[in-house]
């Protein structure tokens, strides 16, 4: 007998879990279909393990770069990679248990397996069919790989989290935040690290101040940056090492090569054609602002839609979808404007709103006023390894409404959230000026710029 549900989510990542739990809280009969571990990319091979590794790299940097000038004997005999990975795994296991407990409390049926559409209301999982009035596609994304000879010798971000040991020489290929974060972590943990970017700098879509400062720090502290670097081939050598060959004739030999050139939607194995769901030329599911696909009763959230590929975005969109469908809020939807984001680089980056070039293009040069601050992060100021901290406010109009907030430096990852609330609420430069600073902090620079 075919089992019927009010709501089914395909994919047990951030968006699927958030949406299905919210629907179940409103009394809907729900099922979540996931073939792998709960939590999706974020928990298993993304945000969570990445942040653990970032913390580990920070600890090593604190010991070796800053500890001596603070008076500490920083002699360390060894670093145990296995201990770090075991601690990380235990933490992720606790998150899995938490998800299982919440889903169980909400009476959500968790079905282990791969789902495929039979038609717009029917799915096939493990040889059985199930139906639903509403179906959410939250299948996420996966790493992309270049089409070059020897590509199989490299690993991707998923593979990084499966490494049994930290190798001595590592190359990361990519210019986006994933590449920057991985290269920063590996460099911070002590490996000889190379970052290869196709054009003149990493993070080119960010405000120029961010990218320029990041390059400045990389040139001083690593990883070694290779610009205008287009991969041509990868050769595996007799000793097991890998040589990355570039189109311009340059090459670099390393022990491990990581592809971090972007991500693509994981929509190709669920038989969307049987349901009639439309995708764009890149394979992303086409949705409107309410997360509706072109087929009534089928929705999509998260990385498989090509929207902002961040965990909190998928969570927020998924919850709002369930509020609209099951809590009598017909206009509930996620506002995708002014979404804050942090890059866990070394040092961290925080940004929300328009970059300076975007603001000038949108409003005109005569309507834009920019405030900047540049200083040495206090944490590093008493050491020989001084690191810059730079901040920018982008304001428009006679009232100087703040439309962009950007920063790079120690603590930026934690301080941005509150300032993002202010920008979202329409704060002006005068509002910031009227706020008394907290001293001594880096955050005070945002309310004392002149």
At which residue positions do the language-model features occur?
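Glycine-rich dinucleotide-binding loop and its adjacent helix/turn
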Residues: 47, 139-192, 196, 224-225, ...
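Residues forming the flavin
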Residues: 2-3, 8-12, 18, 26, ...
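FAD-site-proximal beta/loop scaffold in flavoenzymes
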Residues: 152-168, 251-328
């Amino acid at each position: 007998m075919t089992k019927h549900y009010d709501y089914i989510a395909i994919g047990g990542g951030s968006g699927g879990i958030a949406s299905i739990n919210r629907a179940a809280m409103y009394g809907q009969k729900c099922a979540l279909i996931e073939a792998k571990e709960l939590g999706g990319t974020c928990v298993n091979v993304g945000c969570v393990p990445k942040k653990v590794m970032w913390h580990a790299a920070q600890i090593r940097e604190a010991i070796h770069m800053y500890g001596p000038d603070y008076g500490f004997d920083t002699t360390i005999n060894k670093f145990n990679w296995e201990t770090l990975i075991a601690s990380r795994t235990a933490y992720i296991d606790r998150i899995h248990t938490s998800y299982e407990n919440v889903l169980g409390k909400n009476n959500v049926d968790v079905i282990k397996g791969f789902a495929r559409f039979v038609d717009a209301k029917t799915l096939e999982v493990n040889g059985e069919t199930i139906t639903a009035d509403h179906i959410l596609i939250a299948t996420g994304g996966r790493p992309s790989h270049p089409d070059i000879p020897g590509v199989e010798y490299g690993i991707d971000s998923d593979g990084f989290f499966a490494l049994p040991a930290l190798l001595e020489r590592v190359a990361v290929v990519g210019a986006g935040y994933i590449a920057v974060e991985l290269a920063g972590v590996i460099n911070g943990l002590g490996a000889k690290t190379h970052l290869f970017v196709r054009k003149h700098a990493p993070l080119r879509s960010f405000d120029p101040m961010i990218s320029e400062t990041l390059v400045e720090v990389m040139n001083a502290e690593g990883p070694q940056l290779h610009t205008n670097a287009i991969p041509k081939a990868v050769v595996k050598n007799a000793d097991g090492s890998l040589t990355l060959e570039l189109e311009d004739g340059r090459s670099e030999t390393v022990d491990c090569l990581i592809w971090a050139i972007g991500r693509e939607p994981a929509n190709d194995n669920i038989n969307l054609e049987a349901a009639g769901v439309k995708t764009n030329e890149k394979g992303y599911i086409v949705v409107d602002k309410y997360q509706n696909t072109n087929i009534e009763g089928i929705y999509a959230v998260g990385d498989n839609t090509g929207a902002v590929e961040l965990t909190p975005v998928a969570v927020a969109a998924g919850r709002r979808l369930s509020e609209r469908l099951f809590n009598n809020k017909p206009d509930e939807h996620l506002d995708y404007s002014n979404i804050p984001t942090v890059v866990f680089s070394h040092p961290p980056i925080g940004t929300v709103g328009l970059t300076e070039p975007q603001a000038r293009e949108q409003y005109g040069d005569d309507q834009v006023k920019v405030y900047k601050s540049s200083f040495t992060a206090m944490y590093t100021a008493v050491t020989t390894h001084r690191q810059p901290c730079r901040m920018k406010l982008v304001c428009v109009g006679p009232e100087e409404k703040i439309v962009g907030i950007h920063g790079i430096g120690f603590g930026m990852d934690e301080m941005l959230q509150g300032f993002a609330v202010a920008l979202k609420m329409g704060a002006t430069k005068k509002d910031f000026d009227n706020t008394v600073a907290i001293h001594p902090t880096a955050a005070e620079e945002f309310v004392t710029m002149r």
